[in-house]
């Protein structure tokens, strides 16, 4: 057996339909598209969300919510990720240097996820209650 001798099982593959090739083919003249109408035409398709002129669902429902501008410049940092930071005092600049946050981030919040293996000093970052307890348990402290 070689790759060039392989072929599908008999009856497995059928020839593609050649539309518009006479009455006898069953797909002549209108090529299976029916008579007139949008879907019979070239490029004719109903756009997603179009409901035949009725007001579409996405326009019937009310708008809601907004994107907080503060959340765009705020990052969340896991407690376990602080182990990657080599600085003794961890602040925004130290997090940037460790590649934990992007350059556009101006505020960061440390939350309890994972374990802290070394004593660190947190300066100028927001900290959750659980993270604060874990940092102090590891011998670290939090400065405002």
Curated annotation (Swiss-Prot):
UniProt keyword terms in alphabetical order: Ribonucleoprotein, Ribosomal protein, RNA-binding, rRNA-binding
Subunit: Part of the 50S ribosomal subunit.
Gene name per UniProt: rplO
Protein name: Large ribosomal subunit protein uL15
Region (Disordered): 1-54
Gene Ontology annotations for the cellular component aspect, listed alphabetically: cytosolic large ribosomal subunit
UniProt keyword annotation of Heme present: no
Transmembrane segments: none
GO annotation (BP), single: translation
Source species: Saccharophagus degradans (strain 2-40 / ATCC 43961 / DSM 17024)
GO molecular function: rRNA binding; structural constituent of ribosome
InterPro entries, sorted: Ribosomal_uL15, Ribosomal_uL15/eL18, Ribosomal_uL15/eL18_sf, Ribosomal_uL15_bac-type
Ranges of Gly residues composition bias in the record: 21-31
UniProt-listed HAMAP family: Ribosomal_uL15
UniProt family annotation: Belongs to the universal ribosomal protein uL15 family.
Keyword hit for GTP-binding: no
NCBIfam families from the UniProt entry: rplO_bact
Task performed by this protein: Binds to the 23S rRNA.
